[in-house]
Amino acid sequence: MPALVLIGAQWGDEGKGKATDLLGGAVDYVVRYQGGNNAGHTVVIGAESYALHLIPSGVLRTDCVPVIGNGVVIDPGVLLSEMDGLQARGVDVSRLLISADAHLIMPHHRALDRVTERYLGKARIGTTGRGIGPAYGDKVARTGIRVQDLLDPGIFRQKLELALREKNQVLTKVYNRRRIEVDEVVEEYAAYAERLTPHIADTGLLLDTALREGKVVLLEGSQGTLLDVDHGTYPFVTSSNPTAGYAATGAGIGPTRINRVIGIIKAYTTRVGAGPFPTELDDKVGEELRRIGGEFGVTTGRARRTGWFDAVIARYAVRVNGLTDLFLTKLDVLSGFDTVPVCVGYEINGQRTDEMPMTQTEFHHAKPIYVELPGWHEDISGVTRFADLPEAAQAYVATLEEMAGAPVSAVGVGPGRAQTLVINELI
């Protein structure tokens, strides 16, 4: 069986956890392929809500194997805390597999992330301060420490000593911060190694074998398309590639194994942190969207910026990711509006464009061009068939589909597992 990819089609927080959980019942493996604990998924099952940061949402399905791929950067302390929290709630985490090739977030990564962000002042990007960027930086610089190094204490110490020789110079002499002691880190990470060793595996080989045997593999991205380090609103982006092109690399499988790419997209738009946001609503309407939609970060708790649906970035996401399907979430949040504006293009320096601007300078100056669509006032959270939605809601979905250029195959009308209207089967 081929693999399928699930990605965020906006600035993250689109509802990927809900989508992954829904599809999890039909897949054998769910693989996280990039990012770190700087993002979060929320999955609601009945009266229970689960916030996941590193562990793939598939862990909540007993017949599904959750995998953390080689493209992820892992803070082992955070991972173990998340595992313990799930275990305490009766969730079996023994099936979790971790790629030996994934990189570790170290104490010096967190320290440098926090102090650098403070040093930048008003020019700061708005990172979570969890060390993700510095960890990816060391990976590219070939000075990183990987999960497999936990299996060899001698190699781990050798790599750590080499890393801290430089990092401590920066921390103490540039930022006037305390040096990080090798022995303390070795002791801390040895305890992590003891607990994580049973979960470490050659996950790329395992997944390729599973695909050859006809198993279904779901590749789950974190964050969103507009936060991609190459294709996002740089420099206000994450340090990895959430887009579909990285899914195979970050999971350790060949790209020809993938035949479907599903983009998760909200019925409106949100963003966390700094950076351009053409449709942002800095008014009472924006506050209302935030309140009704519960728009606060799973990882940071920060209030999300809110705005109307942006068809320009939707088209961009379809193009950059090669999306075959859209999964529209939070349609229920828009109930109660007389009309719902949708951004169909931008005005930049007096000129109209319907496509993503080539430069970030242009994007910063983009003014949204709206069309007003009829709204609806009915509560749609209990609707179980797309055909039973109010006509205006159906028309809204159809319009977004046409503007984005990809079929809407599922619609979320609430946070629960059962609150999803499937239009086209995704698996």
Curated annotation (Swiss-Prot):
CDD domains: AdSS (cd03108). Its main location: cytoplasm. It is found in: Cytoplasm. GO terms for molecular function: adenylosuccinate synthase activity; GTP binding; magnesium ion binding. GTP binds at residues 12-18, 40-42, 304, 330-332, 412-414. Gene3D superfamilies: Adenylosuccinate Synthetase, subunit A, domain 1, Adenylosuccinate Synthetase, subunit A, domain 2, Adenylosuccinate Synthetase, subunit A, domain 3. Substrate binds at V298, T299, T300, G301, R302, A303, R304. The active site is at D13 (proton acceptor), H41 (proton donor). It catalyses: IMP + L-aspartate + GTP = N(6)-(1,2-dicarboxyethyl)-AMP + GDP + phosphate + 2 H(+). Coiled coil: none annotated. GO terms for biological process: 'de novo' AMP biosynthetic process; IMP metabolic process. Its cofactor is Mg(2+). SUPFAM superfamilies: P-loop containing nucleoside triphosphate hydrolases. InterPro entries: Adenylosuccin_syn_GTP-bd, Adenylosuccin_syn_Lys_AS, Adenylosuccinate_synth_dom1, Adenylosuccinate_synth_dom2, Adenylosuccinate_synth_dom3, Adenylosuccinate_synthetase, P-loop_NTPase. Keywords: Cytoplasm, GTP-binding, Ligase, Magnesium, Metal-binding, Nucleotide-binding, Purine biosynthesis. GO terms for cellular component: cytoplasm. PROSITE patterns: ADENYLOSUCCIN_SYN_1, ADENYLOSUCCIN_SYN_2. It comes from the Bacteria. IMP binds at D13, E14, G15, K16, N38, A39, G40, H41, T128, R142, Q223, T238, R302. Pathway: Purine metabolism; AMP biosynthesis via de novo pathway; AMP from IMP: step 1/2. It holds the Pfam family Adenylsucc_synt. Mg(2+) binds at D13, G40. NCBIfam families: PRK01117.1, purA. Belongs to the adenylosuccinate synthetase family. Homodimer. This is Adenylosuccinate synthetase. It comes from Parafrankia sp. (strain EAN1pec). The gene is purA.
